Amino acid sequence: MPIKKIESVRKRDGTVAPYDEQKIAEAIAKAARASGLDNGTIGRDLASVVTMYLERYHERETPTSQEIQQLVEKILFDTGNAPIARAYIVYREFKDVNEFMRELKPMLKGGVRV
């Protein structure tokens, strides 16, 4: 199977934006920090896995933002990072960081499992 470079992403509103691995890394790192499991490189490390997967296995050249988010969740769970995956899922739902933290704290304290 030929490897293709992922150059763009189709956003929820239908517009196409440049693919930015750094945005994925930052989102993973934020979730890792929120879950208390940030090792300083997990965002970059797993974002590169997401990019490699997309380049090798994605059927279309332009993945959607939803497909990328689902892939991030899968990779987080598959690599044994379920607490980070849970934080990432919650984080996706909130644009406001303060609202995100208010929702996340009870989950982390209560040991909620997905």
Residue ranges and their predicted role:
Residues M1-V114:
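Extended catalytic cores of very large enzyme megasubunits
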